[in-house]
Amino acid sequence: SGSCTLKTCWKKMPTFRDVGNRLKSYFDGAVKVTGGNSGENLIPEDETVKQPTIKDLVYSMESHDFCEPDRKSGSLGTEGRRCNSTSMDVGGCDIMCCGRGYHEVLAEKRENCRCRF
């Protein structure tokens, strides 16, 4: 009689947060480029930036300003949207309001909770 051993290997995806952090890192280091004459190489617009590698994120056109409405892209802008005054992230008022300022409103809401004792 013989014994049999079973070995299973698999690849595991990183957490969603890890993937997001890596993408954000690529985004923050993205380089604006133009095409070379041969069409095979990319040339950074900023001469002080190193030549991008195959793993670098590059772009060729600036994004429109998401602060203002833009019919062509379908962006409604950020004016009138709710923001988080305590957040320093993209949902925070300092970033979302694009320097226009914002009004902070403190509201009290009373509801019947239908509590029973």
UniProtKB/Swiss-Prot annotation:
Reported function: Ligand for members of the frizzled family of seven transmembrane receptors. Probable developmental protein. May be a signaling molecule which affects the development of discrete regions of tissues. Is likely to signal over only few cell diameters.
Give compartment(s).
Secreted, Extracellular space, Extracellular matrix
Cystine crosslinks: C83-C98
- Annotated family: Belongs to the Wnt family.
The record's annotation in PANTHER family points to: PROTEIN WNT-6, WNT RELATED
Task: Determine the domain of life of the protein's source.
Answer: Eukaryota
Q: What's a BP term from Gene Ontology annotated to this protein?
A: Wnt signaling pathway
Residues glycosylated per entry = N84
Give the species: Strongylocentrotus purpuratus
Q: What is this protein called?
A: Protein Wnt-6
**Keywords linked to the UniProt accession:** Developmental protein, Disulfide bond, Extracellular matrix, Glycoprotein, Lipoprotein, Secreted, Wnt signaling pathway
May I have one GO cellular component term?
Answer: extracellular region
SMART domains in the cross-refs: WNT1 (SM00097)
